[in-house]
Amino acid sequence: MKVPNSRSGMMPPAGIVGLGSHVPSKVMTNEDWAGLVETSDEWITTKTGIKERRIADPDVCTSDLAVIASQQAIEEAGLSPDDIDMLILATSSPDVPLSSTAGITQSTAEIPGC
């Protein structure tokens, strides 16, 4: 099904057809934090609602996690990387300050059509 588009006249619909996620295996709890700074699990939980966070190894980048998640999403959707028209990645922790982590992910995951 095609839908109207002011630039080209018609365009295919967009949608999310697969989801993937990946987080580091190392867990840092509030008790771990309390051992490093003057605070407590109760204070952190009360003020932030956070009970634990995942910590990536120093040699693991955001795009490394995103590649695994994108491969899961593609597999879940029953597609191949060649079928992907767009990759959207939003992060507050990019691999490098002035390059697109989405572009790095696209290249590493071998998604050519974006």
Model-derived segments and spans:
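Electropositive phosphate-/nucleotide-binding environments in soluble metabolic enzymes
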Residues: 10, 27, 34, 38, ...
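Alpha-helical scaffold segments in soluble metabolic enzymes
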Residues: 15, 43, 68, 72, ...
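Outer-envelope exported proteins of Gram-negative bacteria
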Residues: 18-19, 86-88
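Conserved catalytic cysteine-centered active-site region
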Residues: 45-64, 91-114
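Phosphate/pyrophosphate-binding loops at sites that engage ATP/ADP/AMP, CoA/4′-phosphopantetheine
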Residues: 69-85
